[in-house]
Design a protein with these regions (language model features):
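Domain-level signature for proteins that mediate thiol-based redox and metal-cofactor handling
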Residues: 1-103
Length: 103
């Protein structure tokens, strides 16, 4: 497979991932973090970093809007639910493990 075709396939898969996340607003970012150690905000950060690597200035809110398909504040108001105590405890444990691994 040539590089251009590979890039086009990767881009198509990424667009499909974004649409899947937009269609499944019931899946909360904290759920994604707990299961896969990334979330929509991570994707926005990676998107913005990729833009910066190519000399394109992009503010984080603009990257979030690309990932969420709407301004983050709007998505949060419509779809984000309060994290449960169990979810928060699990996130704290993951953070502790990450910090311990970094030392």
């Amino acid at each position: 497979m040539d590089e251009q075709t590979r890039i086009e396939l990767e881009a198509a898969a990424f667009r499909r991932l974004l649409q899947h996340l937009r269609d499944h607003t019931d899946v909360q970012n904290i759920d994604l973090m707990l299961l896969a150690d990334f979330c929509r905000n991570c994707l926005a950060k990676w998107y913005g970093a990729a833009a910066k690597e190519r000399g394109i200035e992009m503010e984080y809110p603009a990257a979030q809007e690309i990932i969420y398909g709407m301004p983050y504040a709007e998505w949060k108001a419509k779809y984000q639910k309060e994290a449960t105590p169990e979810q928060l405890k699990a996130m704290e444990e993951i953070q502790r493990r990450k910090e311990a691994a970094d030392h």
